[in-house]
Amino acid sequence: MPLKQTITHNLLNIPGWHTNRKIVVIESDDWGSVRMPSREVYEEFLRRGVRVDWDPYCRYDSLATADDLSALFDVLISVKDKNGRHAVLTADTVVANPVFEKIKASDFREYFYEPFTETLKRSPRYDGAWELWQQGMDAGIFHPQLHGREHLNVKKWLRTLQSGEEVTRLSFDLGTFGLTSAVDPRIKNNYMGAFNSGLDEDIAEYDTIITEGQQLFEKLFGYKSESFIATTYTWSPKIEPSLIRNGVRYLQGMVHQKMPLDDDTTFKYKKDNFCGHSSKAGLTY
């Protein structure tokens, strides 16, 4: 890391929580989400002239196979701290994905979702993957926390699908939603920010999404997630009471927060979410 960047990072940490303990935090987002369904879909996008190779998320972000998880767990158990404990990965998880065939049958007017564990069953390449999730949790080296119900702005996505926009419809037909203008200029909307609105009508819908997401999380993992990290670090403070009602106590993320003021066009930037401080609603950063 360049010296200037190192100094900047250290300065940002000064107002936050401090400890003399040597703590290493390992966390990773987007577990459970369909971004690139398969190598075959990736190659089909390229064949159609959609440059998914320009976006690292499209190139590398996919559901983890049993082999992927085994390799990860091998690394985690290869090291121990001074107390003899193995490394632990916090897996920030979206618990659901769209059910494409049902959405299409509704002429793109209704949204349906399924637990990501059902998505895993749709391809033999994920055989045994869910069992590895459970083994990692049982071993205490893999700890999911809530990233959202799905990594998707449902309202915006359905609206664009109804309009017939070419690349978004193509990606839908290929079983994904995670393309941005980085891969094709015809894409005018980014659907990855699940909470990218500050409108009251959308906040009410987000309350449902958060509640259903936490309920599904508890059903899958056997406990409620105490922390939450918003997709794309974007959320309105208006959703925080819903998080609290659903058992969330902590907000993961960066020092900065992108706060939508309307329907995903105007934003305010908050840059003081320091570790150990609290939001106005009472959640701890």
Task: Walk through the language-model features, giving the residues of each.
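Catalytic alpha-helical scaffold of carbohydrate-active enzymes acting on polysaccharides/glycoconjugates
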Residues: 2-227, 233-282
